[in-house]
Amino acid sequence: MVTTLIAVIGTLAGTGLAGLLQHRTARTTRDDSRRDAAVQAVAALAAALADHRRAMWVREDLRLTGASPEAYEAARTESHATRSAITAPLTTVSVLAPALAPAATAAAQAAYDLRAAADRTALTTDRDRAMAAADGLVAAAARRFGA
């Protein structure tokens, strides 16, 4: 009788432990998957921000140097496309890593701020500020997700 009772208790304890381990493994897998998605979103956002900075630099440089209306309009169209490409990764970062949302939003705004620079010096300053903000986002992500 005692042997049977010990066997039943051992079986129940083993089943409980197996269930607990399975639950922890599933949770770890979900956390890892979410982390990977957030890191990918930050990388996509950093690339989109770099593309938009480049497009805005070209656009504003053309405006400041008095380029042809056709060249400016082509650059303007490109900058609209690159700005639009920021939306999805910015939203994904904000949803998956809310702690990074302020840095992500600041980096996006800094890229948008290249618009209507007063002169080439201001354009360079704005670009440098946008690059620093994007670097700040990447550094914040590294602190949050780094090994």
From Swiss-Prot:
<protein>
    <recommendedName>
        <fullName>Protein KilB</fullName>
    </recommendedName>
</protein>
<keyword id="KW-0614">Plasmid</keyword>
<comment type="function">
    <text>Involved in plasmid transfer.</text>
</comment>
<feature type="region of interest" description="Hydrophobic">
    <location>
        <begin position="1"/>
        <end position="20"/>
    </location>
</feature>
